[in-house]
């Protein structure tokens, strides 16, 4: 009886798997290197990611009366109702004391400035963006200590 049952299972499994290709017939594609040269579309999107939209439309390179050339700006996006933003504020105050006029911090309340938040793709709060010469140096979408911000800024001064 056991032999008959084993034979029936073997015959049924043979008919069930008759359409499955044999492993010998399967052709493996050559392994591609994960590091490939950037194509023109990748370069375009990389350039778009690194360039920062202007805060105010003007023919000069000034934001709020401050020349953007060789100046580091910290854009700080927050909301009054955000608990982590309330913790981030004092950290930025420490940063202002450390660097003085070398670093300019612009605080942007997303409840009052929704357009700017949309242009900068703000998805989480608090968000801190460090910019120099209109290029994003760092973007943090979480709470960041003043020591972490200081080390990032010192690399680019």
UniProtKB/Swiss-Prot annotation:
The active site is at residues 82, 85. The keyword Transport applies. Residues 46-157 form the Thioredoxin domain. The disulfide bond between Cys-82 and Cys-85 acts as a redox-active center and is reduced by thioredoxin reductase TRXR. It holds the Pfam family Thioredoxin. InterPro entries: Thioredoxin-like_sf, Thioredoxin_domain. Keywords: Disulfide bond, Electron transport, Redox-active center, Signal, Transport. Belongs to the thioredoxin family. This is Thioredoxin 2.
